[in-house]
């Protein structure tokens, strides 16, 4: 089962609720590429057998390799439980969404929180969490 961007975003909790305004130091628009490391039961319809502990170990190994300079796109191809290339444009809270972007409020909370804190080229991680990142671990690289 291959997930495309639109279904994956729906799966990852797309909501239309307006939240508070973006923080002044945060950018208005970003583009990120991510690797989703799920675990058994975290992605409905995907037969993932790893445990949450195995997912955490794998996610942090990928993060370490990425921060050491491994080709991020190659890591996405090799490891993501989302569709390749895993690139998403996002507009911040209170900012109009440009063509091809998704509103930050429509993404899993931790995904946007990490993405908007990164500088271009930086890599971070959103830990699996039932409320803020229920689909697994997101290794996120800000590309724009």
Indicate residue ranges for each PLM-predicted region.
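A residue-level signal for beta-strand positions that form part of recognition/binding surfaces
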Residues: 29-34, 139
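Acidic/histidine-rich, surface-exposed loop or edge segments in extracytoplasmic proteins
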Residues: 33-46
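Acidic/polar surface patches and capping/hinge elements
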Residues: 18-30
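Peptidyl-prolyl cis-trans isomerase
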Residues: 48-144
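Bacterial N-terminal signal peptides
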Residues: 2-12
